[in-house]
Amino acid sequence: MSSLPKYQEIYRRFRQAIDQGQLRPGERVPSVRALAQELKVARGTVETAYQLLVSEGFFEARGQAGTVIAEALPPMSVKPTPVALPGTSGPRPLQMGLPALDAFPRKLWARLVTQQVRRTDADSLAMGDVRGTQALRVAIASYLALYRGVECSPQQVFVCAGYAGCLTLVCDALAMAGQRCWFEDPGYLHARQLLEHHGVELVPVPVDRDGLDVEQGMAREREARLAIVTPAHQSPLGVALSPARRQALLEWARAQGSWVVEDDYDSEFRYRGQPLAALKSQDVDDRVIYAGSFSKMLFPGLRLGYLVVPVSLVEVFERGAHALQQRSAQMLQLTAADFLEQGHFTRHLKKMRQLYAQRRGYLVEALRVHCAAFLRVDEQAGGINLLARLVVDVPDRAVAEAADRAGLAVQALSSWTLEVGRGQGLMMGFTNVATAQQAKDLALVLRSVLAECAGLSTR
């Protein structure tokens, strides 16, 4: 049984038959309906395969005369554009939250790892400090002071196993089980799931064009113990927390004795305007716990996140870290420290900003050309994902499920909401859309899915 999505299996069968001369220019191919019935698959599945073949010049659609093999075929040396990567550990098409894995400097990273291996001594083979290696904590503190305006000592930095490890440590150190927490609505799905797993009572706070609505938060639960926010680039709407609301949030935390977790999500990837200052850089009363992660900037398998905690919380977080014993591999931490200290990290981010702006443009243009009847892409100043609003009356979860069956890893906006009525849309990643042709192919697949869900035909 092939692990390929069915539409791609049909596509490849036709390509093979054309390349081997079994199907010749001008020959008719079965209608979408006939082939779907013969193969016992949905019409949209066959339609998607046919659209890809038309887009690459192998089929010609002749209206009522049907579809035929193109008279002027592309050369055989032109390989089919990969639309999906099934059966591998690589990214799925349009998968969110991933950096461009093809652009990571693997040779440089391997050299740094090798250097660390050569320096291995007895101490580096031990369990290590539960707060993280001193070298990485120093490097993080230095980077944050220089590039995010966050002044802290290495003693305030706690290295965790990814962002999930950061939230786990926060929940444990602050004894959040049964406590109330402001949570952006819509907000980061995996964070919501993890907080609920730890028994945190989430208070949904609406997000609008100015970010988290602090007045709504105070009206709903003024005495919440914690607020979790993404002020630089809200996840998933992409808006920034306005200066007035930043100040209101900090004043609320000071007045109530509450804490704010700043998830500095995607702040490094901004494509227009100046980078926004971290909320922590404005935190004169020391009520903000700053959270960052290397997973979306380097590679997800690194599983390295970090917290910068207020001075008053260092001891309680140390106790929490000792209780949890969630260490990341020392070798990876030391390699990451070298990557930061030697300037490779900032050079990599600069390169990725340029690359992501280009790849974002590929996908936005492809969606505009091929999916405008179904979607409207939100304008966002940065980030590594797109949000496209549905302009047809189709449930976004139904579209996401159908897209998943077609091999696309899009997500429904409504899945990221706590309260109903927050909008319908599709979220998708663009960082691994390497070419304009690949973006076009993906948009055609998505268009077919949308048309099928809307009960329309794209032929």
Stretches with model-predicted labels:
Residues M1-Q116, T120, L125-D129, L136-V138, ...:
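N-terminal basic, amphipathic alpha-helical segments
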Residues V113, R118, D123-Q256, E268-F269, ...:
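Conserved core of the PLP fold type I
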Residues V157, S258, V288, L375, ...:
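Short, conserved active-site loop motifs that form the nucleotide-linked donor/cofactor pocket
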Residues P99, P231-S235, K296, V433:
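Short glycine-rich anion-binding loops that position phosphate/pyrophosphate groups of nucleotides
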Residues Q64, S281-V316, S328-M331:
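Active-site PLP attachment segment
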